[in-house]
Amino acid sequence: MSTLDRHREPVLRQPSTAARVAGAGAGEPRPVTGGPHPLDAPALASLTGPHAHFAERRGRILRYPVDVTPWTAHPDAPDAQDWADLAALAGPGGTIGLNTLREEPPEGWEILQRVAGVQLVDESVVPEPDAEAVRLGPADVPEMLDLVERTRPGPFLPRTVELGTYLGIRRGGALVAMAGERLHPPGWTEISAVCTDESVRGQGLAGRLVRAVAYGIRERGETPFLHTSAANTGAIRLYEALGFRLRAHPEFLSLRAPAALPPTEEARKAALR
């Protein structure tokens, strides 16, 4: 695949994935560090790159607005100040999404959900526009949210549509399938919210929309990638058949912050004076 070659680290070549899977505050930013490859920390690469205008930041923690997407950028091994900054961004008792933590969260945090995932990259996808696909925008959000509620492809919120191009297919005027763009590390774009209504499943609409979204990404000279649950073997088989290949096994977590925020670094320093 030509575009992937420009960004490539070796793609894991192995049997089918589906077969195998049965102290600074907001005013004092600290350097944010991530993995050597943008897809090792895709939220960080997005929020410090093409999606920087969405970023809400405190210390080394960056997140998207709560009505855009749950993705949060954080160090591989958050320290006490990072957790304090996460709590401040989430708010007392608020929820926040993290990925692939090396250690369990500190006392006071509650893990609401832990999902084993897979990350796949375009290796040999044949992208092509789809004559039936239409561009979706803010006016379509109520229908998009309704389709997501029925099909559960993963998080899709009222402003997620602002992250990139979303395409849909309508039958009888009703939105029955969609897919679009979410995370945007430099040189890469994530395909997300791939879903089809039960009434039209088996007609190949999901594959058509993935290829159509991939076409727009490739036209920009970028490479598509995507995430899904490791348990979603049907989706993994589809993506592999389209030409995506396994790259990594991230873990996605949804956490609830402590009901009472920890003291800030400034407050701790003041108490010592």
Q: How would you name each of these model-derived features?
A:
Residues 2-39, 123-154, 265-273:
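Short amphipathic alpha-helix that is part of the acyltransferase structural core
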Residues 72-78, 194-201:
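A short, internal acetyl-CoA/4′-phosphopantetheine-binding micro-motif in the GNAT/acyltransferase core
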Residues 110-122, 227, 245-259:
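Conserved catalytic-core motifs of GNAT/GCN5-like acyltransferases
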Residues 103-109, 207, 230-248:
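Conserved active-site alpha-helix within GNAT-family acetyltransferase domains
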Residues 1-105:
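N-terminal charged segments
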Residues 81-86, 202-217, 236-241:
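Conserved acetyl-CoA-binding loop-helix of GNAT-fold acetyltransferases
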Residues 98-102, 216, 225-236, 252-262:
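Conserved beta-strand-loop-alpha-helix junction that forms the acyl-donor binding cleft
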Residues 155-165, 169-197:
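A conserved beta-strand-loop-helix scaffold within acyl/acetyltransferase catalytic domains
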